[in-house]
Amino acid sequence: MTVNTPANPDILALGEAMIEFNQSAKGEPKYLQGFGGDTSNFCIAAARQGARTGFVSAVGADHFGRLLIDLWERENVDTAQVRVDPQASTGVYFVSHGPDGHAFDYLRAGSAASRYAPHDLPLDAIAAAKVVHLSGISLAISLSACDAALEAIAHARANGVRVSFDTNLRLKLWPLNRARAVMLEAIRQTDICLPSWDDVTELTGLTGRDEIVDFLLSHGPRVVALKLGKDGSYIATPDERRVVPG
């Protein structure tokens, strides 16, 4: 089952969205419900800037899945390619606050998004888009989701659709060696690469700003936007480099 809204997205993002429960105060057994998911957040942010966006994923046939669909519809994100999986639940995570900072606990094993597979992909919608966006989490949540993400990238490239990729490395989801191999495979087929400083130094072992973007550009992207936290971003193409302040 899919949920439909009347739109023709220029930007499609593939990944996982989750329900967040954020502890309201240290030591208090109260949690505020919110929403999480890097590619979902990307879609919402782009839609707020006027882009026509759509999300590609799966949610459970449950209350939390309905909450996510309602969120996207309020934010003008197309949900035509969101599957409702009657045999799985929507993933959730908890944020707790203690003396050592924030702690995250994820309940995503067997979730609808983690069950997503290549045969679920909306190939026609991908071919009709202008940009397909994915992240390291899109690749990491399960083997079938990884296969689907890589197939989406290949199909986009075969149809002249640009690919945007945010590294978003999460080593709780997969070991570094596998993350490095799979992400580099994705980066080789990426037009716009969006790594964070911490991610890319972990993945490459490099520590110089220019050597990092040289390495990434040599693997195929036409644009690298190296995210530097409060210092902004370092934007690099084969012909130009500049810092965009934060």
Residue ranges and their predicted role:
Residues 21-30, 134, 240-246:
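Glycine/charged-rich beta-loop-alpha catalytic/anionic-binding loops adjacent to active sites
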Residues 13-15, 105-108, 133-135, 166, ...:
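Short beta-strand segments
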Residues 1-12, 154-158, 205, 209-246:
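Conserved phosphate-binding/catalytic region of the ribokinase-like
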Residues 131, 137-214, 221, 231-233:
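Conserved beta-alpha-beta core of the PfkB/ribokinase-like small-molecule kinase fold
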Residues 52-137:
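Conserved N-terminal subdomain of the carbohydrate kinase-like
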